[in-house]
UniProtKB/Swiss-Prot annotation:
This is Elongation factor Tu. Residues 19-26 are annotated as: G1. Keywords: Cytoplasm, Elongation factor, GTP-binding, Hydrolase, Magnesium, Metal-binding, Nucleotide-binding, Protein biosynthesis. Its EC number is 3.6.5.3. The lineage of its organism: Bacteria, Pseudomonadati, Pseudomonadota, Alphaproteobacteria, Hyphomicrobiales. Belongs to the TRAFAC class translation factor GTPase superfamily. Classic translation factor GTPase family. EF-Tu/EF-1A subfamily. The gene is tuf. It is found in: Cytoplasm. Mg(2+) binds at T26. NCBIfam families: EF-Tu, PRK00049.1, PRK12735.1, PRK12736.1, small_GTP.
């Protein structure tokens, strides 16, 4: 049978399953597709199809990720599930699979484990907006008090990492029962209840086009008699001819006016998210703008040099470093379209960072970059990628 075409008349949302190894993330993913397939909202994808996820490259890093899609009455979802813990770390840090929200899977039989904690921390650091919880394997626990205890532990852990632990919906069930068609109240019905909480609790993300205008500068030309043209792909928002914009990063911020927008050599009255455009800037000299700056809606983005980041350092096999690095490491940080040198300070108690580690670190750049939380970057040495990171918070 041919692939069903999903009707794109529902709002779209990207989610994923996170949590400790063997707590049932992949079983739950399979169970969601099985239960929603009954109402035509999904094609059932079996556990072993999801588990042998294909490898993908994101920013030069190989990541195994499985993608399934399904829909509820309310939304259309793209759902990511990773086979290994390292894949989650890489995925969340590189933003390879954007997550607007996540389902944290915790085994009721084991309670929160080290990767439960690490995935919650990563979700906080990389800016996953909302989590819901599925307490799995409740068929293996006879003691109701034990279930309450695990729920309490999970809520405390969420609160510790600045998620609203008291308010986050927790659904108790068994992915295996749902897959095997047993005990519907903890199987089939629990999966439907979980999807209701995902629908209700994970906020609908804003579409890129509705956000404030931003375009990274890729190239700058001067056209005699017309002025300076800046080219790039609009990252978000809309820019209209005649609008005032700011040029931010690397140099002091300046204001200018967009006097023309062209795409494929045709003049347009606006450029929007996803468009590759040339923007003609009034009274701007060719040497006033350079690659690595951004054009943006005035006041929407500020230039910064100091930030806290969550980073993943590539292994030797991934083409990364062969040796550890220490505080005062000075690589290049590749933001959007350019490299800027920065100095790394490791957290108290972290002596060094080995290839294959993920780490929270402080960075100070030698030149300011238009920056905000959740912005992704690559860490490079002489043009070779040795790591990937995300801005967790801005220091100054």
């Amino acid at each position: 049978m041919g692939k069903e075409k999903f009707q794109r008349n529902k709002p779209h949302c990207n989610i994923g399953t996170i949590g400790h190894v063997d707590h049932g993330k992949t079983s739950l993913t399979a169970a969601i597709t099985k239960v929603l397939a009954e109402t035509g909202g999904a094609t059932y994808t079996a556990y072993d199809q999801i588990d042998k996820a294909p490898e993908e490259k994101a920013r030069g890093i190989t990541i195994s990720t499985a993608h399934v899609e399904y829909e509820t009455k309310k939304r259309h979802y793209a759902h990511v599930d990773c086979p290994g813990h390292a894949d989650y770390v890489k995925n969340m840090i590189t933003g390879a699979a954007q997550m607007d929200g996540a389902i944290l899977v915790v085994s009721a039989a084991d309670g929160p484990m080290p990767q439960t904690r690490e995935h919650i921390l990563l979700a906080r650091q990389v800016g996953v907006p909302a989590l819901v919880v599925f307490m799995n394997k409740v068929d293996m626990v006879d003691d109701a008090e034990l279930l309450e205890l695990v729920e309490l532990e999970v809520r405390e852990l969420l609160s510790k990492y600045d998620f609203p632990g008291d308010d986050i919906p927790i659904t108790k069930g068994s992915a295996l029962c749902a897959l095997e068609g047993k005990q519907p109240e903890i199987g089939h019905d629990a999966v439907l209840a979980l999807m209701d909480t995902v629908d209700a609790y994970i906020p609908q993300p804003e579409r890129p086009i509705d956000l404030p205008f931003l375009m990274p500068v890729e190239d700058v030309f001067s056209i005699s008699g017309r002025g300076t043209v800046v080219t790039g792909r609009v990252e978000r928002g809309i820019v209209k001819v005649g609008e005032e914009i700011e040029i931010v990063g690397l140099k002091p911020t300046v204001k200018t006016v967009v006097t023309g927008v062209e795409m494929f050599r045709k003049l347009l009255d606006q450029g929007q998210a996803g468009d590759n455009i040339g923007a003609l800037l009034r009274g701007t000299k060719r040497e006033d703008v350079e690659r690595g700056q951004v054009l943006c809606k005035p006041g929407s983005v500020k230039p910064h040099t100091k930030f806290k980041a969550e980073a993943y350092i590539l292994t030797k096999d991934e083409g990364g470093r062969h040796t550890p690095f220490f505080t005062n490491y000075r690589p290049q940080f590749y933001f959007r379209t350019t490299d800027v040198t920065g100095v790394v300070t490791l957290p108290e108690g972290t002596e060094m960072v080995m290839p294959g580690d993920n780490v929270t670190m402080d960075v100070e750049l030698i030149a300011p970059i238009a920056m905000e939380e959740k912005l992704r970057f690559a860490i490079r040495e002489g043009g070779r990628t040795v790591g990937a990171g995300v801005v967790a918070s801005i220091t100054e």
